[in-house]
């Protein structure tokens, strides 16, 4: 055993002294209660630091806590020691040495390396014929940094030896992430083999889906028992849905649903409501065929098109990746690549673009000491810690260094030299941000746009105090709907984070070339001749912008003026312009045969973008607003009884749901109220309540019981319901709105019944045709908006409005036929030049293909 201060740059590192077995045992006695043997289910981190991308390959090695089994690099192990008092760590180090050369100058014959025992990936950039690995393990005792070499059966207590062996033999908590093996991590649903499917004649079209209970047209799930199409859960950015798919399961007990838009020949995203997780359905093709979706035909069709499709799209791959061009590798801060974990390029491209934005750099990397110091005991399960870790890894330059002796090698090898690319592996980050998500937890390719919105949700949910970097993307969209029959209008606003531009194929400027190409291609196919060179449709950006601003028909529009369904027309404008504008070109669609298709187009995206002409103007002179009346509510006969049973006694609050919400960072009392007012329906439903009410002044106030039945009048004085303004108690309003009724309905019903909850519910059921008091509603909304503004003052405006003039600074491109396949790369303009980020490879771009992008990132030009 030796005391090695040299590990930490301390003197005396070369000295060592042998100690008797009794001395080692005596040294470990105070720490024995803290040394654990890993149990089944314990995650043992041996490959990567929780705060950095240090590994056993790093210069300082890796320290594994023998109690928590978390790993830390040399720079961060002291922080964990100070925070937890854990003193015993296993130090792991892998040495890479050049093999001894033979007399002829070549390497000696390759021998089995008996000194490799760590479960680590080898460096693909090192020739195994020239280099060999040697792994080293030691116990280190803090704070004096005593070292005990391993193995040491003779001197170590039996418990310590068992614990060390268990740590060394444990597998990584992250399985080998490739498309084939990751899929096996999803369990097969126990309902798949004997799933009941109703013979109700339902057939699902390949497009035009809409939730059966609301007007949402995204995040839709097909129930595999009865063919119902319903929306998923709600997210911060107003995407997601109203949770009707889950409600349908609770009403019917039909357990399995598949997400529309994810169905490919290789599978789809299937969720089991009963099992509460993403699952595999081995009979998915049969279950989908029941509703007219023929996956086997899709597979045959894709294979039939494969030979014809791949060749034309080779040029797309070559152009976007700048194949055939000698690209200069880039190193240093901001030029770090991300290794591909197996179809993780969508994540890598989005994160490279995100951390090129100063607001995200400041929020995370700028707050690194504070975030790391106040991280939870398990930092691998904390979003802000992992975002900061990733941001530091990308921006520090610590993991993007030129290869050793690169200048000398380049002189000797010239153009034959292949530069070494370091890069970092986002395995821990991906595992955290994708957990419990049916799409991103798989290792199939995903849509970069969907991941961008998912990331924004997480940033919103885990914002650091008053700082919310995703504010730079947020903007307000004004939607104007006009009743075609009465010509009256309604103006509403919603929050969004990106601008979706349709592809105006009819505006292609090379139609004659496209027609000639299509004729030649078909002739070549029929005669089995080589296909002609691809002709790509050239679409003016102005045409896409025009298509975005044109009116669109609204299906199933309910006119409050007619109090009936009518034809409606909707136009969208910007009520505010964001600091950073994200533009998505909607290149993907489905054919009538359910095969995902991609518009292979070239859009002349501008470097400078002016959208000031799309600024919303609100109600115009001469326009008459539609009455503010909600459509009548159709309620099943048993709904009242079922809803009343949701009211629970405070002593029966589900504390497990409360703790789940509290672990997300919400105030404990707010979590208790959320679970209570949603009738113990679970953490997910309670989370939605929190989102709706988190801006209210009494959000974190303790739970106080509203009145029930005859006790309502007694409770009214507590909540101020009998005040001069007849304001209903907010808690009672929350109970009714949590049942699915509109807030305005709840207020009107409570005012009409002196805030008696039971009578208010009776009033709602007996007055489905009631008209809301518009003046009161407007006053309430103004008060709510005033509260939001006053709450937002410390953190700045929630919407960063300004000029609509922008300049392009990044874009993400997709290669392939579908978002569920292919590859993503990112181009970012840094220091006046374009740089391509292609997984772990970072190079100066010679010809950035700005016309072939999928997502574009613009920053506002200061006026």
UniProtKB/Swiss-Prot annotation:
<dbReference type="GO" id="GO:1904288">
    <property type="term" value="F:BAT3 complex binding"/>
</dbReference>
<keyword id="KW-0862">Zinc</keyword>
<feature type="domain" description="USP">
    <location>
        <begin position="336"/>
        <end position="861"/>
    </location>
</feature>
<keyword id="KW-1017">Isopeptide bond</keyword>
<keyword id="KW-0677">Repeat</keyword>
<dbReference type="InterPro" id="IPR038765">
    <property type="entry name" value="Papain-like_cys_pep_sf"/>
</dbReference>
<feature type="active site" description="Proton acceptor">
    <location>
        <position position="823"/>
    </location>
</feature>
<keyword id="KW-0479">Metal-binding</keyword>
<dbReference type="InterPro" id="IPR001394">
    <property type="entry name" value="Peptidase_C19_UCH"/>
</dbReference>
<feature type="binding site">
    <location>
        <position position="211"/>
    </location>
    <ligand>
        <name>Zn(2+)</name>
    </ligand>
</feature>
<dbReference type="GO" id="GO:0008270">
    <property type="term" value="F:zinc ion binding"/>
</dbReference>
<dbReference type="Pfam" id="PF22562">
    <property type="entry name" value="UBA_7"/>
</dbReference>
<feature type="domain" description="UBA 2">
    <location>
        <begin position="727"/>
        <end position="767"/>
    </location>
</feature>
<dbReference type="InterPro" id="IPR018200">
    <property type="entry name" value="USP_CS"/>
</dbReference>
<dbReference type="InterPro" id="IPR041432">
    <property type="entry name" value="UBP13_Znf-UBP_var"/>
</dbReference>
<dbReference type="InterPro" id="IPR016652">
    <property type="entry name" value="Ubiquitinyl_hydrolase"/>
</dbReference>
<comment type="similarity">
    <text>Belongs to the peptidase C19 family.</text>
</comment>
<dbReference type="GO" id="GO:0070628">
    <property type="term" value="F:proteasome binding"/>
</dbReference>
<keyword id="KW-0863">Zinc-finger</keyword>
<dbReference type="Pfam" id="PF17807">
    <property type="entry name" value="zf-UBP_var"/>
</dbReference>
<keyword id="KW-0378">Hydrolase</keyword>
<dbReference type="GO" id="GO:0004843">
    <property type="term" value="F:cysteine-type deubiquitinase activity"/>
</dbReference>
<comment type="subunit">
    <text>Interacts with UFD1. Interacts (via UBA domains) with SIAH2 (when ubiquitinated). Interacts with BAG6; the interaction is direct and may mediate UBL4A deubiquitination. Interacts (via UBA 2 domain) with AMFR; the interaction is direct. Interacts with UBL4A; may be indirect via BAG6. Interacts with NEDD4.</text>
</comment>
<keyword id="KW-0072">Autophagy</keyword>
<feature type="domain" description="UBA 1">
    <location>
        <begin position="652"/>
        <end position="693"/>
    </location>
</feature>
<dbReference type="GO" id="GO:0036506">
    <property type="term" value="P:maintenance of unfolded protein"/>
</dbReference>
<protein>
    <recommendedName>
        <fullName>Ubiquitin carboxyl-terminal hydrolase 13</fullName>
        <ecNumber>3.4.19.12</ecNumber>
    </recommendedName>
</protein>
<feature type="cross-link" description="Glycyl lysine isopeptide (Lys-Gly) (interchain with G-Cter in SUMO2)">
    <location>
        <position position="405"/>
    </location>
</feature>
<dbReference type="GO" id="GO:1904294">
    <property type="term" value="P:positive regulation of ERAD pathway"/>
</dbReference>
<dbReference type="GO" id="GO:0031647">
    <property type="term" value="P:regulation of protein stability"/>
</dbReference>
<dbReference type="GO" id="GO:0006355">
    <property type="term" value="P:regulation of DNA-templated transcription"/>
</dbReference>
<dbReference type="InterPro" id="IPR013083">
    <property type="entry name" value="Znf_RING/FYVE/PHD"/>
</dbReference>
<comment type="function">
    <text>Deubiquitinase that mediates deubiquitination of target proteins such as BECN1, MITF, SKP2 and USP10 and is involved in various processes such as autophagy, endoplasmic reticulum-associated degradation (ERAD), cell cycle progression or DNA damage response. Component of a regulatory loop that controls autophagy and p53/TP53 levels: mediates deubiquitination of BECN1, a key regulator of autophagy, leading to stabilize the PIK3C3/VPS34-containing complexes. Alternatively, forms with NEDD4 a deubiquitination complex, which subsequently stabilizes VPS34 to promote autophagy.</text>
</comment>
<feature type="active site" description="Nucleophile">
    <location>
        <position position="345"/>
    </location>
</feature>
<feature type="cross-link" description="Glycyl lysine isopeptide (Lys-Gly) (interchain with G-Cter in SUMO2)">
    <location>
        <position position="311"/>
    </location>
</feature>
<keyword id="KW-0833">Ubl conjugation pathway</keyword>
<dbReference type="InterPro" id="IPR001607">
    <property type="entry name" value="Znf_UBP"/>
</dbReference>
<dbReference type="GO" id="GO:0008283">
    <property type="term" value="P:cell population proliferation"/>
</dbReference>
<dbReference type="GO" id="GO:0044313">
    <property type="term" value="P:protein K6-linked deubiquitination"/>
</dbReference>
<dbReference type="Pfam" id="PF02148">
    <property type="entry name" value="zf-UBP"/>
</dbReference>
<dbReference type="GO" id="GO:0005829">
    <property type="term" value="C:cytosol"/>
</dbReference>
<dbReference type="GO" id="GO:0006914">
    <property type="term" value="P:autophagy"/>
</dbReference>
